[in-house]
Design a protein with these regions (language model features):
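Polytopic transmembrane helical bundles with strong interfacial aromatic enrichment
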Residues: 1-470
Length: 470
């Protein structure tokens, strides 16, 4: 194998590895921040103590997720300079300011109010504390806005010109509000809420299966399933519109996702399953539904979709990868809709908290939000290849002039460190979830912490328990 391409493959694998670890933590923290804000609002309005109990419980898990997200985000951003210097030199005039806006608005907002949210109980008034929690939740949404603006510009670039081999911005409004941005923003934001809803529902299911029937456990289980009932179908509708937008601006990606090689007139079938073969230029063992591809992607019975053979081989995404990553995402999405629908039926029959079979299903579905999220990102990023800025700069042009050995050494270091550090973080969150919210007869000690060895100076300080004692 050519050394340069070997280094490119390793650099891509390394970035995929680090960004996959990173995205799961912000996704969870985005959803949990809003969930905690709603819980605190309900506590202020009703005065019911279990809302505050749930606030305190989920704030601990949010603190760990937020801390992990910040650390992994910093490491990921360094790779733009170490492994992707070509991209930074070419497009840094667009992506750099967008990331700066994210730090100057969202991160400063989150960092400024996070301490009050985590450590301000009984230090500030309840309304001031709720205001801080609300600001943190808003900050996570603003962060999503800027990150998705940058990523969407790489998918559907506009508002620039190339001068002396570098991107020069000419219209920041066009750059930020590029053609795919609204669809990606709503798709990702709702995905984050669904991720959090599934985690909350799974945690509630675990404690219901263990015999707890206190109001706090029942309430978080119920709230998560109500949210899922609303958002899972909405996500499917947004995904449909996102697909139509992608067909317009990235038709090769759609052809790869659908495993379509030929441009068929009179209606395009949908390949439900199959194994795309990039060398043979065919999808083996395809199970086809006539006209359904046209109906879904063009909303017409005989709409035309260009096949992959319409594009040069060097411009084709890897259909084998995106074909299956997309189906994993969609399949899990239907399972989420099914979970929410069953919950609604059980609720009507008064058996939501008594059906152990359903609770096991909800527990099993807990991690699927993360899996679906990662599958979706694999689809959108692998489907963009071979471009890093679609139609403008190839990924091979973006990589730093490194040897395969250099990239492989850093890759091994990342794998070891990430599994140790983030494995510990995930284990810690699972232990906290297993412990559950405080029982009604065990009051929270939310007095200001004056211990000299437990100064509230970082998110992890919000979690009093040691791993060994949870």
């Amino acid at each position: 194998m050519d050394t340069a391409f070997s280094a490119l493959d390793l650099a891509r694998l390394q970035f995929a590895f680090t960004v996959s670890f990173h995205i799961v933590f912000p996704a969870l923290s985005i959803g949990l921040a809003s969930f905690i804000a709603v819980l605190e609002y309900r506590w202020l309005k009703t005065g019911k103590p279990y809302y505050k109990t749930l606030c305190l419980f989920w704030s601990k898990i949010f603190a760990v997720a937020f801390g992990m997200g910040v650390v992994s985000g910093v490491v990921m951003s360094y790779q733009f300079g170490t492994n992707w210097a070509g991209f930074s030199s070419f497009a840094g005039s667009v992506t750099g300011p967008l990331l700066m806006y994210e730090v100057m608005t969202a991160f400063f907002l989150e960092a400024g109010f996070l301490g009050i949210m985590l450590f301000g109980w009984n230090r500030v008034s309840p309304r001031a504390h709720f205001g801080a929690t609300l600001m943190v939740a808003i900050g996570t949404i603003i962060s999503t806005f800027w990150i998705l603006a940058s990523n969407s510009w790489m998918q559907t670039p506009q508002g620039f010109e190339i001068v002396d081999g570098r991107v020069v911005p000419t219209d920041w409004f066009a750059i930020i509000f590029n053609p795919s941005f609204p669809y990606r923003l709503f798709h990702m934001a709702i995905a984050a809420f669904i991720v959090a809803a599934l985690v909350v529902a799974a945690t509630g299911a675990w404690h219901l299966l263990k015999g707890r029937r206190d109001q706090g456990v029942k309430k978080m289980f119920s709230m998560a399933l109500w949210l899922l009932l609303v958002l899972a179908p909405v996500q499917a509708l947004i995904g449909d519109q996102h697909g139509i937008n992608t067909l317009k601006h990235q038709p090769a990606k759609i052809a790869a996702i659908e495993g379509l090689w030929e441009t068929e007139t009179g209606g395009t079938p949908l390949n439900l399953f199959g194994i795309p073969d990039m060398q043979a230029e065919t999808t083996r063992y395809a199970v086809k539904v006539p006209h359904l591809g046209s109906l879904i992607l063009t909303h017409s019975w005989d709409g035309e979709i260009r096949g992959l053979k319409e594009y040069p081989p060097e411009d084709r995404p890897n259909s084998t990868v995106v074909f299956w990553s997309f189906r994993i995402m969609v399949g899990l999405g239907f399972a989420m809709i099914g979970l929410a629908a069953i919950a609604w039926l059980l609720r009507r029959r008064g058996r939501l908290y008594e059906s152990k079979g359903f609770q096991r299903f909800a527990l099993l579905m807990g991690p699927t939000g993360f899996v679906s999220l990662l599958a979706g990102w694999v689809t959108t990023e692998a489907g963009r290849q071979p471009w890093v800025v679609y139609g403008v700069m190839r990924t091979a042009q973006a990589v730093s002039p490194l040897s395969a050995q250099q990239v492989s050494i850093s890759m091994m270091a990342f794998v070891v460190v990430y599994f140790l550090v983030f494995g510990t973080g995930v284990y810690y969150m699972l232990k906290l979830m297993k412990a559950g919210p405080a029982l009604p007869h065990v009051p929270h000690d939310d007095k200001p912490d004056t211990r000299p060895d437990h100064t509230a100076r970082r998110p992890m300080s919000a979690v009093e328990e040691l791993i060994e004692t949870v």
